[in-house]
């Protein structure tokens, strides 16, 4: 679950981390109230969206007067935000964050993230903060320090000394940095985060390290341990099909292809995506209905896939061990009978009640092509999608 910047800052503030004062507003009058309460004469207004690249795409506005602050907030609250990180979506800006300007001497990058390759958390730092870290990693890899962290949730003294040397911090600044890193680590572990990114962490002209921006992602599988974070979920920042899939309890990820997929089992689903690519096609989604989906869930899952107008072909790929093929067939029939238009459908059914399931589909008059192997199904689906 992604958090908005203000939500991440709310969490970090509880860990006594240095963050400039900020207010969150949903309307211009709320912005005006905040400005008057703080007596700010200048500041920054930041769109609260689940996307990076805000600074480059008009989502962050520096204002040098109260009037400019109000104008910036009014503009942001009435626009849709998109960048190369929004996957083609235009995200609504429902809230803005207002904060005073800070006199910056240096900008740094700091992040703690789960490294899936090494199966452990890593900490990454760079003296090139405030920019796209992907560009730094690609063009100047020597400017990025990356270290694995112990599973205890602590950081060793020698690692902190290495960080201070790499970042060229003198002792007073290093002392601040050490404290910030330790507190960030504590928050990362206690909140079951998969990402905690500070960009930028800045050194002010008076010698203080301050967190200006924060991005945080909480592991969905650990949310049951953090019921207080339930209200942080913002469905307006997601594809409507992703939101519906969550409500239905389906494992769904929207992709940019043209072949809609309904598969049972994550391994089989990923193999299906791979073989479609092998034959020159591309999937419109990842959808794993699991082994215990009901007829209703199958029906809703198919309707969900078909609601994507980019889908030209439906590929149903079921290996019925736990899953009953007759249940899949019944759900398919119900879903197709509710569709105004039909698209080419390729079906591979194997396993429990496969003959019964096929008979149900044939007797219902559902236009489709049955195949007997994954490769045959993938090749046919790709051909029909062209």
Swiss-Prot record:
Keywords, in A-Z order: ATP-binding, Ligase, Magnesium, Metal-binding, Nucleotide-binding, Tricarboxylic acid cycle
Positions bound to Mg(2+): 199, 213
Binding-site residues for ATP, renumbered to this chain: 46, 53-55, 102, 107
Family matches, as Pfam families: ATP-grasp_2 (PF08442), Ligase_CoA (PF00549)
Recorded metabolic or biological pathway in which this protein acts: Carbohydrate metabolism; tricarboxylic acid cycle; succinate from succinyl-CoA (ligase route): step 1/1
Boundaries of every ATP-grasp domain copy: 9-244
Binding note for cofactor: Binds 1 Mg(2+) ion per subunit.
PROSITE patterns: ATP_GRASP, SUCCINYL_COA_LIG_3
GO molecular function: ATP binding; magnesium ion binding; succinate-CoA ligase (ADP-forming) activity; succinate-CoA ligase (GDP-forming) activity
Stored HAMAP family: Succ_CoA_beta (MF_00558)
Subunit structure: Heterotetramer of two alpha and two beta subunits.
Chain's role: Succinyl-CoA synthetase functions in the citric acid cycle (TCA), coupling the hydrolysis of succinyl-CoA to the synthesis of either ATP or GTP and thus represents the only step of substrate-level phosphorylation in the TCA. The beta subunit provides nucleotide specificity of the enzyme and binds the substrate succinate, while the binding sites for coenzyme A and phosphate are found in the alpha subunit.
Record's protein name: Succinate--CoA ligase [ADP-forming] subunit beta
Lineage: Bacteria, Pseudomonadati, Chlamydiota, Chlamydiia, Chlamydiales
């Amino acid at each position: 679950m992604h958090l908005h910047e203000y939500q991440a800052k709310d969490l970090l503030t509880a860990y006594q981390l240095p963050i400039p004062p900020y207010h969150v507003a949903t309307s211009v009058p709320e912005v005006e109230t905040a400005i008057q309460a703080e007596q700010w004469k200048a500041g920054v207004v930041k769109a609260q969206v689940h996307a990076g690249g805000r600074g480059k795409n008009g989502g962050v506005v520096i204002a040098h007067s109260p009037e400019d602050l109000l104008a910036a907030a009014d503009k942001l609250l009435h626009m849709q935000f998109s960048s190369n990180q929004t996957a083609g979506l235009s995200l609504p800006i429902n809230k803005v964050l207002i904060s005073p300007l800070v006199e910056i001497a240096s900008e740094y990058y700091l992040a703690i993230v789960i490294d899936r390759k090494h199966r452990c958390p890593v900490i990454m730092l760079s003296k090139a903060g405030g920019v796209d870290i992907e560009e730094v990693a690609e063009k100047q890899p020597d400017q990025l320090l990356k270290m694995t962290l112990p599973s205890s949730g602590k950081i060793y003294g020698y690692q902190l000394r290495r960080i201070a040397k790499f970042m060229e911090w003198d002792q007073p600044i290093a002392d601040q940095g050490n404290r910030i890193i330790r507190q960030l680590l504590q928050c990362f572990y206690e909140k079951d985060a998969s990402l905690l990114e500070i960009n930028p962490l800045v050194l002010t002209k008076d010698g203080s390290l301050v967190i200006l921006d924060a991005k945080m992602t909480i592991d969905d599988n650990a949310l049951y341990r953090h019921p207080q974070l339930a209200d942080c979920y913002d469905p307006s920042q997601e594809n409507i099909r992703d939101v519906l899939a969550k409500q239905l309890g389906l494992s769904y990820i929207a992709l940019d292809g043209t072949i809609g997929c309904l598969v049972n089992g994550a391994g089989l689903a990923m193999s299906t995506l791979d073989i479609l690519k092998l034959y020159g096609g591309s999937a419109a989604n990842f959808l794993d209905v699991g082994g215990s989906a009901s007829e209703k869930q199958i029906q809703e899952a198919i309707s969900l896939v078909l609601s994507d107008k980019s889908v030209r072909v439906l590929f149903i790929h079921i290996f019925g061990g736990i899953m009953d093929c007759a249940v899949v067939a019944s759900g398919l029939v119900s879903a197709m009978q509710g569709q105004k238009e039909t698209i080419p459908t390729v079906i591979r059914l194997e396993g429990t009640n496969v003959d019964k399931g096929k008979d149900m589909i044939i007797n219902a008059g559902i236009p489709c092509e049955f195949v007997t192997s994954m490769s045959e199904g993938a090749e046919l689906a790709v051909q029909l999608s062209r």
